[in-house]
C-alpha cells in the first residue's frame, strides 16, 4: 500500500479531531493517485491503527494497493500489512455516519463474537460504490480477527 499518513483522535476521545484530519488528508491524496507507480486500480483504503502503546491517538493512512515496489512520491509512504483473517462489515450511507458502523462493531458484534481483535490495523475499503455524501454510498470496514482465547 502507498499513501499519505496523519495522526488523529477518534470519536470516542475527548480530543476527537477526526473531522478536521481525515477529509483534508483524502483531499490531498486523491489528486495525487497518478504519481504512484504500479497501482492496482479500483479500490482505495484507509488503514487505522494505534499511533503507539498507551495512547488513544490513532494513525491513519489514506492509500491504494500497489502490485510491486516503485519510487515513492514526495511525502508518501509505503506500508505492508501481514496476511490476516478479517471480519468485514458493510456501511451504507454517507461517510459522516461511518462511526455508527464502527461503534456497532466494537460495542456489540465484537463483544458477542467467538473471535477477538488480533490487534492488527483496521481497514476502510472504498470501491466503486463509494460516494461520500450519498445516502446510497457503500463502503466496507474490516477488522483483523483471531479465535477468542488464542
Feature map (PLM): residue ranges:
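A solvent-exposed interaction/effector surface
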Residues: 1-150
